[in-house]
Amino acid sequence: MITTTPASLEVALYKAADVIRYAQNIAILTGAGVSAESGISTFRDKLTGLWQQYQAEYLVSIQAFEKEPALVWQWHQWWRGQIADKQPNPAHFALGEWQALAKQQGKTWTLFSQNVDNLHEQGGATVAKLHGDLGKNRCHDCAKPYDKAIAVTDTELKHCECGGLIRPDIVWFGEMLPQDAWQTAETAALNCDVLVSIGTSSVVYPAAGLIDLAKQQGATVIEINPNPTHTTAVDIVLPDNAGKILPLLVKALK
């Protein structure tokens, strides 16, 4: 981890603000670190309790659902229960405020996220969800949205009119990203003057490739992460929690 003094962090913060201030097109990528500050566990955290014998990576795979659909559905319902009471943190609210500020200034500002919760929306920001939305369901076979309300305590498998099983509308390992969300993110990365990567490990592809794409097009890349990734594409590192850095950054942009 990069060690910084308060003074050096302040210098990096204002350097980042200066770059962003003169940017017309701004792209934002968020990852699990942003949600972690609201108490939502990341996939790097070991499962506990009833689920400690399983690997999270297995439970979010298409292979697991096709082999053990009841198990996978039960785990996702448990996961939904875990995040149901979680609230946006200062990072989410700062992003919502930043989006409104950028609009006021006539700038293009695009947020795309690897997170499947709805904390960005609660914080006031519009977001393209690269890995889907845990709050929604769809048919595994025909992909038709399933709009009936399902309590997080309901662990019984549901079926679509076509006979297919209902599943969470998120991207599992082995699946393609949602086309609309990916197109939004890719277009933003191609056209941005600055890309800000927040709370992401920069190792989960294809989303992580958006950082390289922006860099190749000449964008400045800024990373906000308490554990910097040391990705070579990064120009400015702000090594602290998003909940601390983003409110300061947005304040500096006003």
Regions found by a protein language model. Name each.
Residues 1-254:
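Conserved catalytic core of sirtuin-type NAD+-dependent deacylases
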